[in-house]
Curated annotation (Swiss-Prot):
Biological function: Involved in the binding of tRNA to the ribosomes.
NCBIfam families: uS10_euk_arch
Family: Belongs to the universal ribosomal protein uS10 family.
Protein name as annotated: Small ribosomal subunit protein uS10
Length: 102
């Protein structure tokens, strides 16, 4: 039986958990084995910029951060289950990658 590894990433953990719950309910309804969603470490991207563009005045900085949340789901890849997973509405903020394995 083939297995599918579904990798999900997003900057919004609420939308990410919503998609994970949809995949989980599909797996329960079709009766296939599923492992996950396994949370991976959150990546924090930081950018610090100077507020003053000309270099004059006091040194004040803006600090910007973006957090990227990731989840991994391993699921048995039978045709019916994969067809249902492909029909899920995925928000724009969520990136999905499906990898099939033997």
């Amino acid at each position: 039986m083939q297995k599918a590894r579904i990798k999900l990433s997003s900057t919004s953990y609420q939308e990410l958990d919503g998609v994970c719950n949809n995949i989980k309910t599909i797996a329960e309804k079709t009766g296939v084995d599923m492992a996950g969603p396994i949370p991976l470490p959150t990546k924090t991207l930081k950018v610090t910029t100077r507020k003053s563009t000309d270099g004059e005045g006091s040194s004040s900085f803006d600090r910007w951060t973006m957090r990227v949340h990731k989840r991994v789901i391993d699921i048995e890849a039978d045709e019916r289950t994969m067809k249902h997973i492909m029909k899920i509405r995925i928000p724009e903020a969520v990136q999905i990658e499906i990898e099939l394995r033997s």
